[in-house]
Amino acid sequence: MMTWSQMSFSDMNSPIMEQMVFFHDHSMMIILMITILTIYMITNIMMNNLLSRSMMEGQEIEIIWTIIPAITLIFIAIPSLHLLYLTDETFNSQISIKVLGHQWYWSYEYSDFNKEFDSFMIPEPEMMKNSFRLLDTDNNLVIPINTNIKYLISSMDVIHSWTIPSLGIKMDAVPGRLNQSFSISSRPGLYYGQCSEICGANHSFMPISLGVTSMKNFINFINSS
């Protein structure tokens, strides 16, 4: 989860999120090089007094400052397109979970196990000392580690957005439409997200809590009432 004054991404917990962070680092490296070069050129121009009143054009320099940015954009575009297609990649899922957005809570259905429940934010007066304000819920979504999960996401009223940054998932929940997303969680723990689409007065009070655990604990959770 995100912490106070954090400048980087939250902990990665899926292959697609790892690729997103790698692409971010790749892009930042290129941007940093461009920034340093630009500052150097501006400083160099301001510090010297060399002028040429007879120079009307510079064919070579025009070719250079056209080709180099084009090559730079290619180095950014290729991994970006690769990542874009990876986010829409589908694979054979082992477990399907249906996610339904409401004003202002989430409903989860384990279609393979005939289990469903609603998930509400824990009000501040009922919070424990180790709870996180505006993030903890009364019923957490639980999934097993290293398992292909398919999320079927929709809404019962207005447009919501089911988002868990650590998994690299952000999918709109649209009434009358069933969107899908896939993920594999590689680390156990409790991960948080929030609705990322303004959906009314209590938009800020419909968090998402996802617990990633072992298959044994997941089966115990499914069998619990």
Curated annotation (Swiss-Prot):
This is Cytochrome c oxidase subunit 2. It comes from Rhipicephalus sanguineus (Brown dog tick). Keywords: Copper, Electron transport, Magnesium, Membrane, Metal-binding, Mitochondrion, Mitochondrion inner membrane, Respiratory chain, Translocase, Transmembrane, Transmembrane helix, Transport. Mg(2+) binds at E197. Its cofactor is Cu cation. Component of the cytochrome c oxidase, the last enzyme in the mitochondrial electron transport chain which drives oxidative phosphorylation. The respiratory chain contains 3 multisubunit complexes succinate dehydrogenase (complex II, CII), ubiquinol-cytochrome c oxidoreductase (cytochrome b-c1 complex, complex III, CIII) and cytochrome c oxidase (complex IV, CIV), that cooperate to transfer electrons derived from NADH and succinate to molecular oxygen, creating an electrochemical gradient over the inner membrane that drives transmembrane transport and the ATP synthase. Belongs to the cytochrome c oxidase subunit 2 family. Residues 49-62 are mitochondrial matrix.
